[in-house]
Amino acid sequence: MGSKEDAGKGCPAAGGVSSFTIQSILGGGPSEAPREPVGWPARKRSLSVSSEEEEPDDGWKAPACFCPDQHGPKEQGPKHHPPIPFPCLGTPKGSGGSGPGGLERTPFLSPSHSDFKEEKERLLPAGSPSPGSERPRDGGAERQAGAAKKKTRTVFSRSQVYQLESTFDMKRYLSSSERACLASSLQLTETQVKTWFQNRRNKWKRQLSAELEAANMAHASAQTLVSMPLVFRDSSLLRVPVPRSLAFPAPLYYPGSNLSALPLYNLYNKLDY
């Protein structure tokens, strides 16, 4: 009963149709039930209503009823919105080039990439190389600049070397005015003269250190003891080899003897043992 009474609420039915009451279902006398106030939303009818119930016409609606039509006007089919194209989605494999509705799919290219490509083509003039192709050229230019920056060794003539050596023998260090005067006389730059004197001073210092080392070695060898022949009581001689360079260079003379003057080392070599 309750479900049937609830189903009767809603928009007023068509003319001549009574509300869903026991009398109307049992076929009682025609009587009109009080109408429900206008404006209440219609409830959906239950599926358990008897087949004897008469449903009002779908197209009829009270002029003052603003309740939504649950069944709606005659089923016109679902409304289809036009498909929204997605340019970022490419055409899947095995499908045609056009999507539903005859819309052509665009290749997989985001709008930002396409805009960037168009902007780059617009900014770069026709025939100009791309930035990627300029990098190897820049590297080659840097290599050439590095090769050009290498200092080349200055080749001096014999007259220039002689004049520089003479000046160096007189003075190891030159003042700025002397260096400028010497450079102008030799047709050289002050930098070249300065570099030559620096190299010459380094060479001179190396020569001094080598000569000093050689002198120290000679002095150490001169201080070594020299062994001479020794005479023992039994008149036996002990010969010790002595270098000839360390023997006395001057001859020895014996007074009152007729022996010719002989150096000591010659006498030493002629002795019999």
Curated annotation (Swiss-Prot):
This is Homeobox protein HMX2. It is found in: Nucleus. It comes from Homo sapiens. Transcription factor involved in specification of neuronal cell types and which is required for inner ear and hypothalamus development. Residues 149-208 bind DNA. Residues 93-102 have a biased composition (Gly residues). SMART domains: HOX (SM00389). Residues 114-123 have a biased composition (Basic and acidic residues). GO terms for cellular component: chromatin; nucleus. Residues 1-152 are annotated as: Disordered. The keyword Transmembrane does not apply. Keywords: Developmental protein, Differentiation, DNA-binding, Homeobox, Neurogenesis, Nucleus, Transcription, Transcription regulation. InterPro entries: HD, HD_metazoa, HMX_Homeobox_TF, Homeobox_CS, Homeodomain-like_sf. Its main location: nucleus. PROSITE patterns: HOMEOBOX_1, HOMEOBOX_2. GO terms for molecular function: DNA-binding transcription factor activity, RNA polymerase II-specific; RNA polymerase II transcription regulatory region sequence-specific DNA binding; sequence-specific double-stranded DNA binding. CDD domains: homeodomain.
